[in-house]
Amino acid sequence: EQQRYLNAKKYVKLFLVADYIMYLKYGRNLTAVRTRMYDIDNVITPIYHRMNIHVALVGLEIWSNTDKIIVQSSADVTLDLFAKWRATDLLSRKSHDNAQLLTGINFNGPTAGLGYLGGICNTMYSAGIVQDHSKIHDLVAIAIAHEMGHNLGMDHDKDTCTCGTRPCIMAGALSCEASFLFSDCSQKDHQEFLIKNMPQCILKKPLKTDVVSPAVCGNYFVEVGEECDCGPPRTCRDPCCDAATCKLRQGAQCAEGLCCDQCRFKGAGTECRAAKDECDMADVCTGRSTECTDRFQRNGQPCKNNNGYCYNGKCPIMADQCIALFGPGATVSQDACFQFNREGNHYGYCRKEQNTKIACEPQDVKCGRLYCFPNSPENKNPCNIYYSPNDEDKGMVLPGTKCADGKACSNGQCVDVNTPY
């Protein structure tokens, strides 16, 4: 599973924000600020392409009336405020994986930016801030790539790290020289982070229509108006795609995709993805497109020796969820512990309505907080929950989990598996 995750193409749906000082700095000219940000995005894209990550700019916001947070010269305070604003305001308006604030303010000391280590896909911590510290947009783009690198699990380079001649992107200090490469250490950090955490949001490919930056032929991503994109003409080796126009060559039906072979659609019924497990199904080509549509067993089909029911292609059971939260020795707590879910507080509730925690009804107690027994020498408490104020949903029983014979959790209720849920 880890190898399949590592090999999968990754996509970071990026949202860029420019603050009010940026707007003033560029003469209150929205087009100038926008162009600056598009230019920066066009530098970030090829940097991450080398890491098998496509960065797609899915949102851009310029604070042209007033700042939506108090931007200040203390970088850590500003990052904290920006991350909270993203979590509570921006995410509810626009789906994205990572947000970066570009500011015209001068941060204290030598700091040009700040980002949370390993924050990608986290509601609270997938964010960074960067000072617009140079007229040369390449250098500012590299600073954003650096903070995104932190979010993607990369630490600062040590003296022994190398990427060729120049200092690399994750160097601890700013350089006047532009470096477009990650070091061997950064690549190792990133790979280890991916294996350990397997962040899911970056597996989802954005739609062409999600991208807000003007289409650029040669950036490896098929955008509106393009049929294919195999990168710059000097490096493209794709026989199906004309790199200069991003159009299919004469006679070609397709250039990429699991149902494309030698520029032609694979025949209808050709298997394009094997079934991963008992809740999945083998996927087949239609003969009319390159898409390999993911199909899975119907929700409610018994799985894992009748310990669970299939739900959206997975088999969620409490035992696995306890192990994921508390480690390999953990088991599900006794039924009595789940009665805490009738309290309607941080430690026990079934769902939230307008941020109010709703207590579980007696029949729904196994669809609220998950209670586990860690079974470790230092923790003999029989009723444990995982609780984090920054991510309250983590530690709740997952949707689709079996809560009784013939029943599964849906919206904090234990419902019959034969009803749609």
UniProtKB/Swiss-Prot annotation:
Zn(2+) binds at H146, H150, H156. It is found in: Secreted. Residues 10-206 form the Peptidase M12B domain. It is an enzyme of class 3 (hydrolase). One of its GO terms (biological process) is apoptotic process. Keywords: Apoptosis, Calcium, Cell adhesion impairing toxin, Disulfide bond, Fibrinogenolytic toxin, Glycoprotein, Hemorrhagic toxin, Hemostasis impairing toxin, Hydrolase, Metal-binding, Metalloprotease, Protease, Secreted, Toxin, Zinc. InterPro entries: ADAM_Cys-rich (IPR006586), Disintegrin_CS (IPR018358), Disintegrin_dom (IPR001762), Disintegrin_dom_sf (IPR036436), MetalloPept_cat_dom_sf (IPR024079), Peptidase_M12B (IPR001590), Reprolysin_adamalysin (IPR034027). Ca(2+) 2 binds at D280, M281, D283, D294, R295. Glycans are attached at N29. A motif (D/ECD-tripeptide) lies at residues 278-280. Snake venom zinc metalloprotease that induces apoptosis in vascular endothelial cells (VEC), without degrading the extracellular matrix (it cannot cleave collagen) or inhibiting adhesion of VEC. Has also fibrinogenolytic and hemorrhagic activities. The active site is at E147. PANTHER family: ADAM A DISINTEGRIN AND METALLOPROTEASE DOMAIN, DISINTEGRIN AND METALLOPROTEINASE DOMAIN-CONTAINING PROTEIN 28. Residues 214-299 form the Disintegrin domain. Its EC number is 3.4.24.-. Homodimer; disulfide-linked. One of its GO terms (molecular function) is metalloendopeptidase activity. This is Zinc metalloproteinase-disintegrin-like crotastatin. It holds the Pfam family Reprolysin. One of its GO terms (cellular component) is extracellular region.
